[in-house]
């Protein structure tokens, strides 16, 4: 399929090459290739995209990114630097690339202002944030965005009419030591990423964020970070138990309603037709978006799987590009009508 849109595609600042190399050594079997791919924007990426039928990519800063910086001033300065940098890069090939804003999430008003700057000045397509913001004197605290203090930020998202991508980050500090240190091979895609994001997004559901901001659009990667597979059980306990005990005060709709109206999932890093079909049955093809998770995953694995998956033509087009066109209000790009 030509003209696919991919929207969980990472980059890193070239000046952090050594840090990126060290980070890559923790998970990549070819750290040097990873460094080259994640710091490149307009050459290697486009070559891969041309070969595999990806017409447009929305780029975002690699995890853990700014969410790993617990000093608010340093975090904000880096977010601005990243946004200014990627704005210059995507301007080279605007028919191939867009960008998500990188945000320091220490202060909701500051985050809202930076998002507005990126959308209004640069035309960014929304924001991607790597789960909770590390905070406190030693970085061991976590800031969640699922309480009323963050209403000013979510209101800005809806005013700008742009989505927010809740991406994972690695567990740190006390949480890492108590839960993951003795189970280090479960950190990341095998388990910890889904734990973090599903907790955060379901917290937004139960704490009434979507009821207060009914037009808010949230994206979850990796086919929904396990939530679609627990949809029946979550719905059963919310509706038949928790709401009778008080959840109804803050959570007015069903979990299925929120997935139909506020939550999207992507195929990033999860290239299974069986799993995709299950998610289509639970949340519908209208709420699923193609993505790769490059360079942590490859264009070839993602695209060859998707192009050859047993899907009907309508669903392939929806997931591959048409849903994203509508969500991000995209104009013409390479092979957008192929």
Curated annotation (Swiss-Prot):
One of its GO terms (cellular component) is cytosol. It catalyses: 2,3-dihydroxybenzoate + H(+) = catechol + CO2. Pathway: Aromatic compound metabolism; benzoate degradation via hydroxylation. This is 2,3-dihydroxybenzoate decarboxylase. Its EC number is 4.1.1.46. The active site is at residue 251. It holds the Pfam family Amidohydro_2. GO terms for biological process: benzoate catabolic process via hydroxylation; secondary metabolic process. InterPro entries: ACMSD (IPR032465), Amidohydro-rel (IPR006680), Metal_Hydrolase (IPR032466). One of its GO terms (molecular function) is hydrolase activity. Homotetramer. It comes from Aspergillus oryzae (strain ATCC 42149 / RIB 40) (Yellow koji mold). Belongs to the metallo-dependent hydrolases superfamily. Has an absolute substrate specificity for 2,3-DHBA. PANTHER family: 2-AMINO-3-CARBOXYLMUCONATE-6-SEMIALDEHYDE DECARBOXYLASE, AMIDOHYDROLASE FAMILY PROTEIN (AFU_ORTHOLOGUE AFUA_7G05840). Keywords: Decarboxylase, Lyase.
């Amino acid at each position: 399929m030509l003209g696919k849109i991919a929207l969980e595609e990472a980059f890193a600042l070239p000046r952090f090459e050594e840090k990126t190399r060290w980070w890559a050594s923790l998970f990549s079997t070819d750290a040097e290739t990873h460094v080259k791919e994640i710091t490149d924007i307009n050459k290697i990426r486009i070559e891969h995209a041309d070969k595999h039928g990806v017409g447009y990519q929305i780029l975002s800063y690699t995890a853990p990114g700014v969410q790993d910086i617990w000093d608010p001033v340093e975090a904000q300065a880096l977010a601005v630097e990243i946004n200014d940098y990627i704005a210059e890069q995507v301007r080279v090939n605007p028919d191939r690339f867009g960008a998500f804003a990188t945000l320091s999430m220490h202060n909701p008003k500051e985050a809202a202002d930076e998002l507005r700057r990126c959308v209004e000045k640069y035309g960014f397509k929304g924001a991607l944030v790597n789960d909770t913001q590390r905070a406190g004197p030693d970085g061991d605290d976590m800031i969640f965005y699922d309480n009323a203090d963050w209403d000013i930020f979510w209101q800005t998202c809806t005013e700008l009419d742009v989505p927010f991508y809740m991406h994972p980050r690695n567990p740190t500090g006390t949480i890492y030591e108590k839960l993951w240190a003795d189970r280090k091979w479960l950190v990341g895609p095998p388990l910890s990423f889904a734990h973090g994001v599903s907790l955060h997004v379901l917290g937004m559901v139960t704490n009434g964020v979507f009821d207060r901001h009914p037009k808010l659009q949230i994206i979850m990667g990796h086919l929904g970070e396990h939530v679609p597979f627990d949809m029946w059980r979550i719905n059963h306990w919310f509706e038949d138990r928790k709401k009778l005990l008080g959840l109804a005060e803050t959570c007015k709709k069903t979990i299925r309603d929120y997935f139909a109206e506020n939550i999207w999932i992507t195929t990033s890093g999860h290239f299974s037709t069986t799993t995709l079909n299950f998610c289509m049955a639970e949340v519908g093809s209208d709420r699923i978006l193609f993505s790769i998770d490059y360079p942590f995953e490859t264009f070839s694995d993602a695209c060859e799987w998707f192009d050859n998956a047993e899907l009907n033509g309508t669903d392939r087009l929806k997931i591959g590009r048409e849903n994203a066109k509508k969500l991000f209000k995209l104009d013409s790009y390479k092979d957008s009508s192929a």
